[in-house]
Amino acid sequence: MAEQLIQFTDRGLYCKAGNFYIDPWKPVGKAVITHAHSDHARPGSASYFCHHFTKPLLQLRLGDYPYQTAGWNEPVYMDGVKVSLHPAGHIIGSSQVRIEYKGEVWVVSGDYKTEDDGISGIFEPVKCDTFITESTFGLPIYKWKPQSEIFESIGNWIGQNHAAGKTSVLMAYSLGKAQRLLGCIEATGLPIFLHGAVYNVHQALVNAGWKLPAVHHVQADTPKELYKGNVVIAPGSADGTPWIKKFLPYNVGVCSGWMQVRGNLRRRNADAGFVLSDHADWDGLLNVIRATEAKRVFVTHGFQSAFSRYLTEIGIEAFEVKTEFGTEDEETAELKDPDKQPAQDEETAELKDPDKQPAQDEETAELKNPDKQLPEEKETADSKYPDKQPAQDSSPDQRDNNE
C-alpha cells in the first residue's frame, strides 16, 4: 500500500516527501503554519513558513525565529513538493495549505469560515484528492446569521448601554473577533478601549501596515470616568476577575459561536450573547467539502466523530483524526470552565483556557442528536467593516503568527 502524502504523527501532520510539518504541536525542523492561534502555531521549531500577513503575529507570540513567507497562490517547493497557501477566512493571514506531489493533491484547511468578514480574506475552495478539515461546529444546530445582522444587534446593545450610562464590555478573543468588532464599534462613534492582550495584537497589526480604527489601551492609571458609556473589548478569560470591576457600571456581551446554544449564555452569567464565530457553521463545512471535490476527507478537532460519520452516511469517504488542535482555540477556550478564575494579569497576559466542548444539560442535550434542530436565538447585527488591505511584506524570508 502506497504511503500517504501526509502522515498523522505524534508531532503533527507530516509530509515526508517535503520533510515538513503542518501546524505541529511539538518542535520540528520546518513548520508550515496555517494561522497564528496558539493551538496551530507553537514555539520551538527551527524554521517557520506562513502567509506574510501572519508573520508579525507569529513574531509577537512566538518570538524571533527564521520566518519564510509567501502570498496566497504563490507556490514554493520543499524538496520537490509544491506547496501553496490559499485564503481560509478564519482570521487575518489564515491560510489553507495545498500540497502537490507526483500528481496527488492534499489540502489542509486549518481553521476556516466561509463568510467574508471584510478583514480576514475571502475563503477560496481548493480542489484536491484528500481534504483535512476542522469540525469545530460540525453539528446541524450551528447555523450562523449574516455578520451584518449580528453587528446590528451589537450596535443596538451598545447604544442601549450608552443611554443607560453603562460601559459595554464585549468578550472576544484577542486575534480574530476582536479585529472584526472594531468596525462595528467604530460605527457607533464611541471611544474603544482594549484589554492588554487585544491591544498587543492591535499594535502588531498597525505596525505591519493595517489600517484599523483608533483605540485606547486600558491601563491602571486610566481615569475610570472615561469608560462610562463607552466600549471595552477583552478576552473572555478576563470576565469575573478584579480587572473588569473598573468599568462599573457595565454590561457584558459574549461574542461566540457557542452562544447559539442558549444554556451557554446562562453559564457565562453574561448580559447578552452574540452568535459570532470565526469558524464555518454546519452548512459552511458541508459546502466547502463538496466544493473541494475530494475523494477522501479526514476530520480533525471539533465534533469530528459525529461529523465524519455524517459524511460517510452521505457517501463521502471520511475518517476521524485525533489531533491537538483546538486546545487553545478562541472558540473552544471560551467555554472551558465558567467558574474557574484565570490568572489575573490585567495588562498583558492572554489568559489561557484549554479546550472543552459545552456541557450538555437539558438545553444542550440536542447536541447529542445531529439531526435535531435547536431554535435560534435572536441576536443579530449590521455595520460594514472597512475592507482595507495593508501593504504586503516584500520580504520572502520572514513570517509571523498569533492566536
Regions found by a protein language model. Name each.
Residues 115-196, 256, 260-329:
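Cap/insert and terminal regions of metallo-dependent hydrolase folds
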Residues 2-17, 21-26, 30, 36-171, ...:
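His/Asp/Glu-rich metal-coordinating catalytic cores
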Residues 12-25, 74-77, 214-230, 236-244:
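Short acidic low-complexity segments
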Residues 24, 34-39, 52-57, 72, ...:
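Short, polar loop motifs at secondary-structure junctions
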Residues 219-345, 355-356, 361, 368-372, ...:
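C-terminal regulatory/interaction regions
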Residues 29, 46, 104, 165-167, ...:
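Short coil/turn segments at beta-strand junctions that form active-site/ligand-binding loops
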